[in-house]
Regions:
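Membrane-spanning alpha-helical segments of multipass transporters and channels
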Residues: 60, 70-191
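Juxtamembrane helix-boundary/capping and inter-helix hinge elements in multi-pass membrane proteins
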Residues: 32-38, 101, 160
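Long, hydrophobic alpha-helical segments
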Residues: 1-14
Length: 191
């Protein structure tokens, strides 16, 4: 559930926020400021990192105290590895904002083209081992797959970085790729 909540909030909100600025014309005003493109991107995405971390802490609190789910691992490690997951969701959100022109398109594209397939291919609903081999290969490109393993490892097994490093490395690689691609497309749309 945590992976889906963060995917929903931290992917859809930034994409809609950037597209809204395109729609109302404030993005053009921001472009003429002396900010470097990377500064603009960080400024646009930083609030959503904070929102994602607040969501993480709220969901963890609800899981522990309302539903009695034990947190056997490190909360600090969970927060740090969640930052890697947020890198992925923010990259996707920024990428979506470069592909669409309206907020409605951003929401629909994010929900139906990205989010639904990612959830089905992550192993959250159907075990990856039960999927056809070709689809199993595709799941290696799905960030939710790795974050779900991280959540299960930290919450249920008390796993540390010694066990979770392959998932963390995958999130870092995919997230860097997504954010780089999205930043390049965003810069081209600014030029």
């Amino acid at each position: 559930v945590l992976a889906m909540v963060l995917l929903l909030v931290v992917m859809i909100l930034p994409s809609m926020a950037v597209v809204r600025e395109k729609e109302i014309g404030t993005l053009e005003q921001i472009i003429v400021t002396p900010l470097a493109p990377w500064q603009l991107i960080i400024g646009k995405l930083a609030p959503f990192v904070a929102i994602g971390l607040i969501d993480l802490l709220l969901a963890t609190g609800v899981a522990r105290w309302l539903f009695g789910v034990p947190l056997r691992g490190s909360l600090t490690l969970l927060v740090l590895l969640t930052l890697l997951y947020l890198l992925n969701t923010l990259g996707l959100g920024l990428l979506v904002s470069t592909l669409v022109n309206t907020q409605q398109q951003a929401m629909m594209f994010s929900a139906f083209v990205i989010m639904v397939p990612m959830i089905y291919l992550s192993g959250l609903i159907f075990p990856i081992e039960n999927m056809p081999h070709a689809i199993q290969i595709v799941t290696y490109a799905v960030p939710v797959r790795y974050y779900a393993n991280i959540i299960r490892g930290i919450f249920l097994r008390g796993s540390g970085l010694a066990v979770l490093w392959p998932d963390a490395l995958a999130l870092l690689g995919i997230g860097t790729l997504l954010l780089t691609l999205a930043s390049r497309r965003f810069r081209k749309s600014l030029d």
